[in-house]
Structures are given as C-alpha cells and as structure tokens.
Amino acid sequence: KAVAVLRGDSNVSGVVRFEQTHESEPTKIFIGQNSILALTVVVHAGTDDYGK
C-alpha cells in the first residue's frame, strides 16, 4: 500500500502516480507537471529522497 499526503492552495491540482516495478524495489511517487511541486520522490524503506 502507498499513501501520499499533499497540501497546497485550493487552486492547486494535479495527478499523483505510484510506480513499483517489483515488490523489492523502491516505490516511485510521480507528482504531475501541473502540480506546484512537479517532482518525483523515490521512497526507500520508509524514507524519501530527502532522508526524512
């Protein structure tokens, strides 16, 4: 299971896509180009690219 919590202004919209090629691979979270973030976060064992 994957869950994303995104916060932003009421006019922010977009698509979030989760991708995992294999159960042992990290989950990639793609945040659409129309979002204010416009980035991809790769989750490794409970952390993100930023080590949180």
From Swiss-Prot:
One GO CC term, this protein: cytoplasm
Localization in the cell: Cytoplasm
InterPro entries recorded: SOD-like_Cu/Zn_dom_sf
Reactions that this protein is recorded to catalyse: 2 superoxide + 2 H(+) = H2O2 + O2
Cofactor(s), names only, from the UniProt record: Cu cation; Zn(2+)
Reported function: Destroys radicals which are normally produced within the cells and which are toxic to biological systems.
Name assigned to this protein: Superoxide dismutase [Cu-Zn] 2
Protein source organism: Debaryomyces hansenii
